[in-house]
């Protein structure tokens, strides 16, 4: 499946003439999804180039255009040709023989090297003030170090690794249709290995299966045993013991003790020594930058930032000269272990519970063609040392959301400050707090930078495109022939924006595959003309489709922000229900557009936008405006008396440079620019624009409507209360509104939590101590009904009903 889907006009009409086909569900598709001509002649974009601003040398050194044409491979497809043997018996035992032939480096003296680490030796000798070794017998401290080390890791067992690889390969072939990996991306990683720096893979986290699948993919490509930093909260003690023998790493609970606690100092020193030994020996390390799936809370993982901070500390201390960071993204048609109830934390997975879950999955997959496809993406590696040097020069001053947005919401000010927003929802761990404040900031911005790159380079799967169409355009149903045409259109729009898709095949077969995966959330009805009608199931099914459609949001995020900003600009001029021609009459100045875009950028959470720290808001506003012009929604309008935009002959040369650094706002109104805010735009009157504009606005509707309903919820007077209890009450309110209004895509606990945290940053809610713990209170500023209405009105201006 290494090319695009093929759009054949005859397939869109075949549903009217194929009387023998009784149901889409009963028709098989799996064996027909073959590599064919690229979709509409478009090439497949090569995703994942590293940041040219922060890492220009890495951007040039580890990439060559020839690797773009290497194509894809199915990692779990192991045949007789993948072994050194031939014959009918080999064809039946190829999985087992393949696992025996994999090279597994062994190191039995790792524990001894960790004990000989300088930091550990200082603890054993009592030379660290306040540590556990001060005033204690060295033997007692040594036993404590060995106990902590046993909690972190054990030496991987080669026999167990081979046995597990064979079992996992067998299981993955029954669970997935394929696991695709670009050969060119793998070649970049292999080239980075030859440079000698240890590899650190920084990945998104979509499923609990990621911790097994990604190490297997890297192991199968000859990168050796990848050590995986796992979350001890998701595993029982028995499962943790097994995973350590397979290369897993776990943080001891003592690392989160206070900075002056002796046990905490000892645990953090052992963790640093362990990571230093892994990096020095050249073992690859895999860190997940997102929180485990299903856990409510911030998107960026506190655990991932802690491990990344230890890696940065090792490089800065000179333990290793450099480390090579590789952003990783993984995409599923459907996440295999997606929890049905997202409102509660997942219980730790036990050894027998996991085995039972695997057995149930195998039973469900037996004789079933509804297997999902997986796409693993390895972005361009880059140097940590180079990023550290260049990134510090991009840092600028930032302000809280309360200072940036609250005066504008209340109507006390109309000017948006020219500073960036400071918003950090991920709580710091003990390992991160032990670093200097400057290094803590480096870890946070690097993790956000890498996660942004990983999400942007992730392939868009067919289920995300189908769910987006059904949710945003056809909640009341659509005939299959029309749905096929719009699926083809949205796929092309995705490719034109430089994003890749994780599927290929005949269009009709692909639709059968996608709808069969979504059969729990859609209904198929046959009409008398012979066509089929696809209808989304109301209720929780729409919430599930909304979660799937969020995978498509990064592709259209800039245009969606711009469309909602235009909607907010027109809200006070034209009635929302007014005709498109009436809205197209209004002139929109560039300064007004910039202001509205900035307001929306400040309102939306950074966990959703994932802006790159090296990019200023000014540059993002310009990018949004450019995207709106490129997609045809905005057209330039020449005001009377102004010089035409195409007339470059009469431009006067200035003695000063006509450019400025991306973070410099001091010269935004300079006279050196003839008409900085004089450019005006109008909405395009093309026939396709109204539908596309509405489509873009609806991409951000779930979170904006959740915020607006959270503002309405303030009227009910549910405060003071704890943050957890208040978030739960808000989620129940969103569910009640969903039942009344049919807006089920807003009934998501994560949206409720985002609304509460945004309102805290905005100064609407305040957290105060109490005997029972911290309590949320309504701030005095928003205690009046008038200011609450202003907040709700400010949010609703961006919503297109």
Swiss-Prot record:
- Sequence segments annotated as region (Disordered): 1-24
Q: Which GO terms describe its biological process?
A: CDP-diacylglycerol biosynthetic process; glycerol-3-phosphate metabolic process; phosphatidic acid biosynthetic process; piRNA processing; triglyceride biosynthetic process
- Motif HXXXXD motif covers 205-210
Which residue ranges are assigned to the Mitochondrial intermembrane compartment in the record's topology? Answer: 333-449
Task: Write down the top EC class of this protein.
Answer: transferase
Task: Specify the protein's topology with respect to the membrane.
Answer: Multi-pass membrane protein
Where does the record place the modification Phosphoserine? 662, 668, 670
- Enzyme Commission code(s) on record: 2.3.1.15, 2.3.1.51
Subcellular location per UniProt equals: Mitochondrion outer membrane
Q: In which pathway does it act?
A: Phospholipid metabolism; CDP-diacylglycerol biosynthesis; CDP-diacylglycerol from sn-glycerol 3-phosphate: step 1/3
Coiled coil segments of this chain: none
Where Phosphothreonine occurs along the chain? 666
Q: Which GO terms describe its cellular component?
A: mitochondrial outer membrane; mitochondrion
Q: What is the effect of changing residue 205 to G?
A: Does not affect ability to promote piRNA biosynthesis
The induction field says: Up-regulated by retinoic acid.
Q: State the family named in the UniProt similarity comment for this chain.
A: Belongs to the GPAT/DAPAT family.
The record's section on PANTHER family has: GLYCEROL-3-PHOSPHATE ACYLTRANSFERASE, GLYCEROL-3-PHOSPHATE ACYLTRANSFERASE 2, MITOCHONDRIAL
According to UniProt, the name of this protein is Glycerol-3-phosphate acyltransferase 2, mitochondrial
Whose protein is this, by species? Mus musculus (Mouse)
Name the encoding gene, please.
Answer: Gpat2
